[in-house]
A protein has these predicted regions:
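Extended hydrophobic leader/signal-anchor segments used for secretion and membrane insertion
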Residues: 1-452
């Protein structure tokens, strides 16, 4: 036990922990102190004490496993279908990229950020102790096309009454609303900063707004399509990395408009293709569907006797979508036509000006904790004028395999290295919420690999 403890201390890299070696020696050898003070060393303990002892041991053991080895993650949304399905429970390896030490070690066991049965309003962690980002040695690094679990970067600020929507999305929509109201009323338009301040104050008055540290932000799972130093480009729905078209996986989905002769497609056909009931969306006219389909399923449906046409639902180049990163009309991008955009790499320096500052605002101001201001088109970092910036962390570009039903980097930008949690390796349980009885359990997905 002592050797294992020393090896663990070397791995963690905090040699002050060697002061705990006498405790380990006493627990296993000398046994002078009753470290499990809640139970008697000799004689029979009450059954309640025995259960309490087992519970304490289980909580400590599972907590250590979650930090250093594996963590469970349940897929809540269809953003990775058909690679990973809603209801899949994943074993996420912490050693794949190296375990990340907690920022907030004082937390109620087995919770992410909220106490159970409180309606999402009571936080489960304390900020009395806050540790800086530290990642232990792992077996490798994040690679292109790895499936990765990470903390949601835009989840640093949350409106408790609207937790399913990003605070920054709420803020942008509020700015658009009050700007439109001024235009309709014929009032003089305000500056960008003034609209921001007004919208922010309205939101803080209307909602309960809180801050969450990195390790207490919601967990997401996506595919890492771009690593530090890569250039991402999307043209007509096709993804290019460094000028080369990226691999299209068999399980990757795109939304299609499927036209029929007025009759509906047999539900059994949808069931065979794995198209869930919630995805079977009829068009307004009722003469077709809008469906997320793999390329293979699209080819299958196109051969149905009552299908008269099928077309991928791609946006036009130049169609500006305000929700798409960097949320700047100067870059008329959308989820199907995006970039080129370079992914920041640790130690690299970029020139800053008013044409590109929106790409790096969150990095400089939030992720790397500087004070960023813009006054009269002059950029100030920590109170000093700045025309360049050197990145202190690596960044990644994450996208869902279900391209038209995924909130991912196309909408909120880069994922910092300190947000990376681990890599899913196995599906250990899969529950289909739309099925009944034993059919709810997808036995065919048990222990299915989830690496690629």
């Amino acid at each position: 036990a002592g050797v294992l403890y020393i090896l663990w201390v070397i791995w963690v890299g905090n040699y002050w922990l060697l002061l705990g070696l006498p405790i380990v020696f006493d627990i296993y050898v000398s046994k002078k102190v009753n470290w499990a003070f809640w139970k008697k060393r000799h004689g029979k303990n009450h059954v309640v004490v025995e259960w309490l002892d087992a519970l304490i041991f289980a909580v400590i053991a599972v907590s250590l496993i979650n930090i250093f080895l594996f963590q469970n993650y349940r897929i809540p949304t269809p953003s990775m279908e058909k690679t990973l399905l809603v209801g899949d429970h994943l074993a996420v390896s912490k050693v794949a990229y190296g375990p990340r030490m907690p920022n907030t070690p004082l937390v109620f066991p087995f919770t992410q950020h909220t106490m159970p049965f409180t309606g999402g309003r009571v936080k489960s962690w304390s900020d009395l102790i806050h540790w800086k980002y530290n990642r232990l040695k792992g077996f490798g690094h994040v690679k292109n096309n790895d499936i990765v679990v990470f903390n949601f970067p835009a989840g640093d600020t949350v409106c408790l009454e609207q937790q399913a929507v990003s605070y920054y999305e709420i803020l942008r929509e509020r700015i658009e609303t009050i700007t439109a109201e001024d235009i309709r009323a014929g009032r003089p338009l305000k500056g960008k900063d003034e609209y921001y301040s007004v919208a922010r104050q309205m939101i803080w008055n209307e909602y309960t707004v809180i801050y969450r540290p990195v390790d207490r932000r919601d967990n997401y799972v996506k595919r890492c399509v771009g690593i530090p130093g890569d250039t991402v480009l999307i043209k007509g729905g096709k993804l290019f990395i460094n000028g080369h078209e990226n691999t299209e996986y068999e399980t990757q989905q795109t939304s299609y408009y499927v036209r029929t002769n007025g009759t509906r497609i047999n539900p059994k056909a949808f069931e065979r293709m794995g198209v869930s009931k919630s995805d079977q969306s009829l068009t307004i006219s009722g003469s077709g569907y809008r469906l997320p389909l793999t390329r293979k399923n699209a080819e299958t449906i196109s051969g149905f006797a009552n299908v008269t046409g099928i077309e991928a639902d791609y946006r036009r180049p130049g169609e500006y979508i305000a929700a798409v990163f960097p949320h700047d009309p100067a870059y008329r991008w959308n989820e199907d036509n995006f970039g080129p955009l370079w992914i920041p790499k640790k130690g690299t320096t970029v020139k800053l000006d008013m044409t590109n500052i929106n790409f790096y605002t969150s990095i400089i101001d939030i992720y790397e904790e500087n004070d960023l201001e813009i006054r009269d088109t002059v950029i100030y970092i920590n109170g000093k004028p700045a025309d360049s910036y050197t990145f202190r962390m690596d960044y990644y570009w994450m996208m869902g395999d279900n391209r038209h039903d995924s909130a991912d980097s196309r909408f909120w930008g880069f994922v910092p290295e300190d947000h990376i949690i681990g890599r899913p390796v196995r599906v250990w349980l899969s529950i289909d919420k739309e099925a009944q009885g034993l059919k709810k359990i997808r036995f065919n997905r048990f222990f299915k690999g989830a690496k690629r």
